[in-house]
Regions:
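Short, charged/polar micro-motifs that form catalytic or ligand-binding hotspots
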Residues: 5, 40, 73, 77-83, ...
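Amphipathic alpha-helical binding modules
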Residues: 90-137
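Short, well-ordered alpha-helical segments
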Residues: 82-92
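N-terminal intrinsically disordered, cationic/polar leader segments
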Residues: 1-80
Length: 138
């Protein structure tokens, strides 16, 4: 993440860290969610952080876009509507998984494969890179 905005960076990190943790969790082949043990945060902690990031990421990007793009703001804001939809859809998927009494690896593997979550990550990378490119030429 190259944009220098701590709030946005935190939202992006929450989403990306959740995704990365889910990849490792899915690979474990767990039928049920561990109830104790282990070192570090649990899956649910990562998913809760991810939920928070998904709630705020579009608004956080909007703030940065309005500050950074000037006359091109409309183009970025138009694309931001796509990111907002993907974030909302991804959050609904995470909410569904969080509602389960126990979360197994297969459910997380399916969440990882969600086209909405993958689209959101691509949206984030595209807007970030576009803003970074723009800042180099201003």
């Amino acid at each position: 993440m190259s944009i220098n905005n701590e709030t946005l960076r935190n939202s992006i990190n929450d989403v990306e860290a959740g995704y990365e943790y889910m990849l490792a969790y899915a690979a474990q082949g767990l039928i049920d969610e561990p109830t104790s043990g282990g070192s570090g945060p649990s899956l649910r902690v990562y998913l809760e952080r991810m939920q928070n990031g998904l709630l705020s990421i579009a608004d956080d990007f909007e703030t940065v876009i309005k500050d950074a793009t000037g006359d091109n703001a409309e183009l970025y804001l138009n694309y931001l509507s796509v990111l907002k939809e993907d974030a909302a859809k991804s959050k609904k998927a995470v909410d569904l998984v969080m509602s389960l009494p126990s979360i197994g690896s297969q459910v997380i593997d399916n969440l990882n494969a969600s086209i909405h979550l993958r689209a959101l990550l691509t949206d984030i990378f595209l807007i970030d890179e576009a803003l970074t490119s723009l800042s180099r030429h201003q």
